[in-house]
């Protein structure tokens, strides 16, 4: 069973279907012409071989052909309680557990001085800056795989800009965010990025690439460990209640579960790009807010970022994320 979307300027009708260069009968639901942007299901009674690659060619009534490579043939995903529980456990392991591990350093970090605070806040900026570039790159890559009618790259830029401006407006209400409010914005930005990670893992498992999915789980888990430290940094001089830490961990890591479900059951490149664009805009807003907080704390303006402790934190944050990202690049 295959989902087909019409991306051309005119309605189209599928006349014939080839699988591995052989013509096969098919059933289209709903039948008839496929209007621009619409989708239909094609059921082809072909003896699919689980795990094998197949080439599918659609021939329209005008003679135009469209070929798609099915890298791994797998059954069409169906929603079951057991499957949702399994994916939720993986999402928690990837998203929530590493965040909680990082937050556990909170008691140890509370004793740091101003230099240590500068380092940790700069570390946070470094982590988030890498996530910003990573989210934008993945969003544009997915946008390039979407149908032309979605205008993928333009959509990514507009959605990211709108998200950034909206969150900046919300964040500035009542003054620049500090303490727990700033930690909440950091957790939100990281959570939206983790939504994209969940999409990638879910899509890998849905495509039958269990090895790749397991590889991504382990890599993203290692990749996310320091994010908890970044979330805790703004509240080191405060004493937030325990429930606040639980909420921050769920906000930052919980979206990975949602991403797993969406990626395995209803993944499409345009919606993946849309979600990652929101994440990129949110992360950019957090980078700006944390940077402004560091400058206010040191009262040196842009010269603040020339301090050794801050330069060291920025470098350490970017370097750690870059090195651990190597475990999830294929």
PLM feature spans:
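Short capping micro-motif at the N-terminus of alpha-helices
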Residues: 14, 26-27, 68
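Solvent-exposed serine/threonine-rich low-complexity stretches and specific carbohydrate-binding patches
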Residues: 25-34
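Short, hydrophobic/aromatic beta-strand segments
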Residues: 10-18
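Asparagine-centered strand-capping/turn motif at beta-strand->loop junctions
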Residues: 2-9
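Intrinsically disordered, metal-sensing/regulatory segments
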Residues: 33-43, 47-330
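A broad structural signal for short, well-ordered beta-strand segments within beta-sheet-rich domains
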Residues: 1, 13-14, 53, 129
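Surface loops and adjacent helix of pleckstrin homology
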Residues: 17, 29, 132
